């Protein structure tokens, strides 16, 4: 296990050093590499060395990708194991590029574009909806399968789900309610399984980009350590076997997202999700956020303030990509609700977060 996560230790060093550009690149690479685990794939040492050079600013992301392509062209890959590593390396480099971009459009076309960009050079069908029905045996279901959408209803189903989500307002929801709704939406998109392969990695990148529109910097650690859990949680959110008392549930996915957004420490164990797991005390060590009554926007503000108590409203607006007017309104509300206070005056004072986040 230690050998598998050497890459994580190496990339963590850039975050510990505290340089913003290096930290951001390292976090993207950690998510990109960790996500390969959803399909049991591992990246190569060559990919890690290339990632380090990119993080250190010696090469840009385009050069990093070209190096990966050239590396495998020279090796003339034929063996299945090496083909899997090649896929992991290429897709990881594409994910790192996408996560660094400050662009996003909430639409089925964006989901399709993400798949195309992740898997160009890997699958001939990159960016194309599947043209046949599928089933997949799942470990967490004892070899049974989720029922995926019929291929001829993919586009209509995606259009419907996206239109419903686009019209939905999170404004009056607290964090717990927001997470439950996000889990339901994301698991629904995954259940459609619009592509032949690569659906989970595509869904993960889409979800990260979507969550960033709420002002969140998504935890790289949660995806780096728990990508397979993420997949199994999506499976359990879409599987029913009423005859045997098994119901579809988003509870596991909600725990994952809560850890991702709030720094909560739910114990994310795959065995807890297995349909034959019977122990009742699944997570005695869970630590729960005390800011469940905040909105997602308020939580994003509190997290930025906790990292930098001297942050200005202008800097807050830039950090979570909201207007200064919105920040001013929200900080006043947070102070009135007892979540935040200002010490030592407006000009030279500091913020103090009064709740655990």
For the regions a protein language model found, what residue spans apply to each?
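FIC/Doc superfamily catalytic core
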Residues: 1-357
